Amino acid sequence: AITGNVSLEQLGRDSFQEIDIAGVTMPITKHNYIVKSVGELAHTVREAFYYAASGRRGPILIDIPKNIFDESCDYVPASRRAPFKPAPNASGLRDAAAVLAAAKRPFLCGGGGIISAGAAKEFRVFAERLQAPVGLTAMGIGAFPRDHVLCTGVVGMHPSAYTCDAMRGCDLFVGVGTRFSERLMANVNGYSPEAKILHIDIDASEIGKNAAVSAAVCGDLAGDGDDPAGEACLPAGLFRRHSGACGVKCDDEPLLFLSHCSASSRTAAMAASVSSSVL
């Protein structure tokens, strides 16, 4: 965002129409600038685009005082810097692989970070190899096909019944690109009482902020070509373990789907009971 302000010599004097826009927007921006000379304007704009797209994407504000618009300078072209994308560290991937290998009823939750990172392909590969039910936050809608056999629907404030049962019964909750805000789950222990949490996110400040995690992977898991980085988290044998649910669509065969994805003995027994009574 680019804003205008009073001239530099009028800043800090309670001038007419002056506003500390940098201070006002600080809580809602990733970074902001006040341009002090026309010579630094081009560099500031380039740097703003770099920081906006690096790591977790976010808004940048550039405040330009009035007198800067009246000045001129020579424009010096510069090459574009590629955004910084932190790679996941090896120890985090090992910890993730360990909790995934131990899980019997994992549940995947896809958030808006998947869309921001352009990692929908990698997330789908991850889910299909794991063969676990997948729910999407409101910001994550579009990160995974809604008509996919593994998709349970939306999680959070307005979830589907299948999503609730899958979350309540899982023994490992895998949050990918989500902040675990109250819109997702106000009480982690209440929603998934038996579950450990694996958090995968590009922003280190979000890890463990709203939910205690058993393992975490911090970095950009978007891969190149046919080798998605997310596959590094998947131990061999997970596909075989959960292959029984392959081809079962929650909307078409919800009872079979729930018997796979729910760890709750009560829910599993209910599903079996209802299934036998229907048959």
Q: What is the predicted function of each stretch?
A:
Residues 1-228, 256, 269-273:
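N-terminal alpha/beta PP-like core and its mobile active-site loop of ThDP/TPP-dependent enzymes
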Residues 223-231, 236, 241-244:
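Short, compositionally biased segments
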Residues 227-232, 250-253, 263, 267-271:
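Alpha-helix boundary/capping motif
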Residues 229-232, 258-259, 276:
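Hydrophobic helix segments
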Residues 242-243, 247, 269, 273:
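Compositionally biased, low-complexity intrinsically disordered regions
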Residues 243, 258-261:
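Short hydrophobic targeting helices and cationic amphipathic motifs
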Residues 279:
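Cofactor-binding active-site loop characterized by glycine-rich and histidine/acidic residues
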